[in-house]
């Protein structure tokens, strides 16, 4: 008499397990992506706050705002007006990018050789890294848009 009892899983059982795993993944992955996007947006806001703070520090120390780009705030062996060592190399690059956001510094009006106004824009690198655009200026107020256009001084302040 032969024993036909085989040990293991049938194809149907394996397909059911795979289907359950796919259903769980379909539920979890969008939530993870939204969480990553929210973290990128929070990082962009924190970076704008950092820029506002270090521009005030730079202005107090050197008597002017950075004249061209963020590299003036960046790392240095010996701090100077062209490399103040106020931010890390990510934020101190000429055209910084951090956590899926690109930052743009625009110096404004010059009075007696001193820049009295500036603006900073933060825009997502793609729609998967963030949906909100941010703006700040010498007032320190951070503003946002969600319509796909860069934020400006007339945009809604963040809460």
Name each model feature, range by range.
Residues 24-27, 39, 61:
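Residue-level signal for short amphipathic helical patches enriched in basic/charged
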Residues 31-48:
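Aliphatic-rich helix starts adjacent to a transmembrane/signal segment
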Residues 1-11:
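N-terminal leader/signal peptides at the extreme start of proteins
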Residues 148-152:
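A short acidic/small-residue loop/turn micro-motif
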Residues 53-131, 136-139, 146, 156-159:
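Extracellular/periplasmic head regions of type IV pilus-like filament subunits
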Residues 15-31:
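Alpha-helical hydrophobic helix detector
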């Amino acid at each position: 008499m032969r024993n036909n009892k085989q040990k293991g899983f049938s194809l149907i059982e394996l397909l059911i397990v795979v289907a359950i795993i796919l259903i769980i993944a379909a539920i979890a992955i969008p939530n993870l992506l939204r969480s990553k996007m929210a973290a990128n947006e929070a990082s962009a806001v924190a970076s704008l706050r950092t820029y506002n703070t270090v521009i005030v520090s730079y202005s107090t120390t050197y008597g002017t705002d950075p004249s061209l780009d963020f590299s003036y705030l960046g790392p240095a062996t010996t701090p100077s007006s062209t490399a103040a060592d106020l931010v890390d190399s990510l934020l101190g690059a000429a055209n910084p990018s951090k956590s899926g956001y690109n930052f743009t510094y625009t110096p404004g009006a010059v009075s007696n050789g001193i820049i009295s106004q500036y603006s900073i824009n933060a825009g997502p690198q793609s729609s998967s890294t963030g949906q909100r655009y941010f703006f700040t200026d010498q007032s320190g107020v951070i503003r946002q848009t969600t319509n796909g256009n860069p934020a400006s001084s007339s945009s809604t302040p963040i809460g």
